[in-house]
């Protein structure tokens, strides 16, 4: 009994000695579990598995063909082969990703025709399952990166950052575009998010390396390059703390040459390893990556400035042809050749050109408004991106960098040439990490996410996809708009704001659902009344214009805060 008592007492003493450490470890473990994305991944994966048998777009055949191209052909023919119309038009690193996937194709999937290099693939359920699973598996990287983002947040920021991380992981864009329409954006944006996390931790070389990898995977990230370039230049390469310009020699000493060599060496090495094997076919590769022969707008107008421009052209054309004296009024204000010289010329232009309502991808011509050239879209994009990156030169903070990154994405989406509606993720993903800083950013963020996600609905035009896309997006907006309102910190200046814009934005967001239901009802009527068949473009136009209003307003709101609300960025 004595020995037993001694053992018990010793155990109690040792337990008391371990107590504080055990409590701390238990609290840390409990906190880790509280902010874990594991349950979200399990639940979302279950939903994605259920969606496997559903609709998929021609992008499924695109990626199947790329598997075949990279598996069957030598390197020098990857960007030359035109057996299928779905030619390889992503950067080489993504081509290597497709090659890696082709190496693990099971025998049953091979026999199903997954790796056949043909003009039009013929495959069945095994190929569908395999390719769907590759999207789900590759998206794991996004969850891992977001978990790192949450775990390495400061304790007081962990809750709001957890909300941001789950909002990105469960984004309707990734569900609709990747797991129904079929693409690999979750994997691609995971690399971009990793570079953002590295920037927050001031690991500048890693940030530059990861962004270079992302760029070599998906060339649309080139639109974000100005923000990365200026941020890394100012934060890592230049030492302007006590800089005083007296002579040009001072500029030499303002450069941290060792840092420049490290960062530049890593970036150039990644680019060299990626593109060097394709040096012999570089012209063909560049032509695939940047096809300026395509038109200003896609077959479905992306909700940007050019959608509104195209809509105004349609309205002016209608008014000048149908309403008396409108043309005379227009010519009294604007003289030819800025507008057509006569009504007959308007009719001739309508008969001759593609005006963006025929679902064609080639160049679009306008009837009333001036024609738009690629050079103009480039200059507009560059102008607004320069405005976005200039503040980073004076304040290379992480907050300024994310604001600049979001506005660079906005500029490219709103004013770029042949922008796809899916490119809205180029804006939403960076903005998601920005909104966590201040409640003043919530209104433009709500406008962007609501209108941006709804603008993706026409991608899934099958009736079976209607309920899932509307219901999932509606639930996401309700949950995350309210969660961010509760968790994002508010500053003192919020109390001095005029809330009319916020209320107007709330009305706009609420009217998105009636717009979607109204367009669906119009589509149902088209099948019953032949007279409505010639107005099939009206539904897509409603999506484009209404969503473009939200995206453009969000851009203007963020631009105002970025350039004129100085306390927000301190």
From Swiss-Prot:
| EC number in record | 2.4.1.265
The protein's GO terms of the molecular function aspect are:
dolichyl pyrophosphate Glc1Man9GlcNAc2 alpha-1,3-glucosyltransferase activity
One of the protein's GO biological processes: protein N-linked glycosylation
UniProt feature, compositional bias: Basic and acidic residues: 1-10
Q: Does the keyword Transmembrane apply?
A: yes
Uppermost EC category:
transferase
Q: Which cysteines are joined by disulfide bonds?
A: none
Keywords, A to Z, come to:
Endoplasmic reticulum, Glycosyltransferase, Membrane, Transferase, Transmembrane, Transmembrane helix
What pathway annotation does it carry? Answer: Protein modification; protein glycosylation
Q: What is its main location?
A: endoplasmic reticulum
Q: Which residues lie on this side of the membrane: Cytoplasmic?
A: 56-127, 234-262, 322-375, 434-458, 519-536
Where is the protein localized? Endoplasmic reticulum membrane
Query: Where is region (Disordered) located?
Result: 1-29
Q: List all membrane-crossing ranges.
A: 35-55, 128-148, 162-182, 183-199, 213-233, 263-283, 301-321, 376-396, 413-433, 459-479, 498-518, 537-557
Lumenal compartment residues: 1-34, 149-161, 200-212, 284-300, 397-412, 480-497, 558-570
| Record-linked InterPro entries | Glyco_trans_ALG6/ALG8 (IPR004856)
Does the record carry Membrane as a key word? yes
Q: Name one GO cellular component term.
A: endoplasmic reticulum membrane
Q: Which reaction does it catalyse?
A: an alpha-D-Glc-(1->3)-alpha-D-Man-(1->2)-alpha-D-Man-(1->2)-alpha-D-Man-(1->3)-[alpha-D-Man-(1->2)-alpha-D-Man-(1->3)-[alpha-D-Man-(1->2)-alpha-D-Man-(1->6)]-alpha-D-Man-(1->6)]-beta-D-Man-(1->4)-beta-D-GlcNAc-(1->4)-alpha-D-GlcNAc-diphospho-di-trans,poly-cis-dolichol + a di-trans,poly-cis-dolichyl beta-D-glucosyl phosphate = an alpha-D-Glc-(1->3)-alpha-D-Glc-(1->3)-alpha-D-Man-(1->2)-alpha-D-Man-(1->2)-alpha-D-Man-(1->3)-[alpha-D-Man-(1->2)-alpha-D-Man-(1->3)-[alpha-D-Man-(1->2)-alpha-D-Man-(1->6)]-alpha-D-Man-(1->6)]-beta-D-Man-(1->4)-beta-D-GlcNAc-(1->4)-alpha-D-GlcNAc-diphospho-di-trans,poly-cis-dolichol + a di-trans,poly-cis-dolichyl phosphate + H(+)
Q: What protein family does this chain belong to? A: Belongs to the ALG6/ALG8 glucosyltransferase family.
Function of the molecule: Dolichyl pyrophosphate Glc1Man9GlcNAc2 alpha-1,3-glucosyltransferase that operates in the biosynthetic pathway of dolichol-linked oligosaccharides, the glycan precursors employed in protein asparagine (N)-glycosylation. The assembly of dolichol-linked oligosaccharides begins on the cytosolic side of the endoplasmic reticulum membrane and finishes in its lumen. The sequential addition of sugars to dolichol pyrophosphate produces dolichol-linked oligosaccharides containing fourteen sugars, including two GlcNAcs, nine mannoses and three glucoses.
Q: What is this protein called?
A: Dolichyl pyrophosphate Glc1Man9GlcNAc2 alpha-1,3-glucosyltransferase
């Amino acid at each position: 009994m004595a020995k037993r008592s001694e053992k018990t007492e010793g155990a109690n003493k040792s337990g008391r000695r371990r107590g504080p450490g055990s409590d701390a470890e238990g609290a840390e473990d409990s906190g880790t579990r509280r902010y874990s994305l594991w349950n979200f991944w399990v639940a979302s994966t279950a939903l994605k598995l259920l969606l496997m048998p559903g609709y998929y777009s021609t992008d499924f055949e695109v990626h199947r063909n790329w598997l075949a191209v990279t598996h069957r052909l030598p390197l020098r023919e990857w960007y030359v082969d035109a057996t299928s119309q779905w030619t390889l038009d992503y950067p080489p690193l993504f081509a290597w990703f497709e090659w890696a996937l082709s190496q693990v194709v099971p025998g049953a999937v091979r026999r199903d025709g997954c790796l056949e290099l043909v003009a039009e693939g013929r495959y069945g359920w095994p190929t569908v399952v395999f390719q769907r699973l590759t999207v789900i598996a590759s998206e794991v990287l996004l969850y891992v990166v977001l978990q790192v983002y949450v775990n390495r947040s400061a304790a007081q920021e962990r809750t709001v950052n957890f909300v941001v991380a789950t909002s990105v992981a469960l984004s309707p864009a990734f569900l609709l575009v990747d797991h129904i329409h079929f693409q690999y954006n979750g994997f691609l944006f995971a690399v971009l998010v990793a570079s953002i996390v590295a920037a927050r931790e001031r690991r500048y070389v890693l940030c530059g390396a990861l962004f270079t990898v992302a760029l070599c995977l998906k060339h649309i990230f080139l639109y974000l390059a100005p923000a990365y370039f200026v941020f890394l230049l100012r934060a890592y390469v230049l030492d302007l703390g006590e800089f005083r310009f007296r002579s040009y020699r001072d500029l030499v000493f303002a450069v941290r040459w060792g840092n420049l060599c490290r960062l530049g060496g890593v970036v150039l090495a990644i680019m060299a390893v990626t593109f060097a094997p394709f040096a012999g076919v570089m012209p063909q590769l560049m032509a695939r990556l940047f096809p300026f022969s395509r038109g200003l707008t896609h077959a479905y107008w992306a909700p940007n400035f050019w959608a509104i421009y195209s809509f105004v052209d349609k309205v002016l054309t209608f008014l000048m042809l149908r309403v008396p004296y409108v043309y005379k009024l227009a010519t009294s204000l604007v003289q030819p050749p800025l507008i057509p010289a006569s009504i007959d010329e308007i009719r001739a232009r309508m008969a001759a050109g593609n005006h963006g309502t025929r679902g064609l991808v080639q160049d679009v011509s306008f009837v009333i408004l001036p024609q738009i050239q690629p050079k103009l879209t480039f200059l507009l994009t560059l102008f607004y991106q320069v405005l976005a990156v200039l503040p980073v030169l004076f304040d290379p903070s992480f907050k300024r960098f994310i604001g600049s990154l979001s506005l660079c994405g906005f500029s490219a989406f709103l004013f770029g040439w042949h922008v796809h509606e899916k490119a809205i993720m180029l804006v939403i993903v960076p903005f998601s990490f920005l909104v966590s800083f201040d409640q003043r950013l919530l209104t433009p963020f709500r406008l962007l996410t609501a209108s941006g996600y709804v603008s993706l609905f026409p991608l899934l035009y099958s009736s079976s996809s209607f309920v899932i896309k509307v219901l999932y997006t509606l639930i996401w907006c309700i949950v995350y708009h309210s969660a961010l309102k509760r968790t994002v910190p508010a500053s003192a200046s919020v109390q001095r704001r005029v809330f009319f814009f916020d209320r107007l934005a709330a009305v706009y967001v609420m009217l998105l659902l009636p717009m979607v239901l109204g367009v669906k009802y119009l589509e149902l009527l088209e099948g019953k009344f032949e007279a409505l068949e010639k107005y099939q473009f009206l539904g897509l136009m409603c999506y484009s214009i209404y969503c473009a209003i939200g995206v453009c307003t969000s851009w203007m709101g963020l631009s105002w805060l970025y350039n004129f609300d100085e306390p927000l960025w301190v």
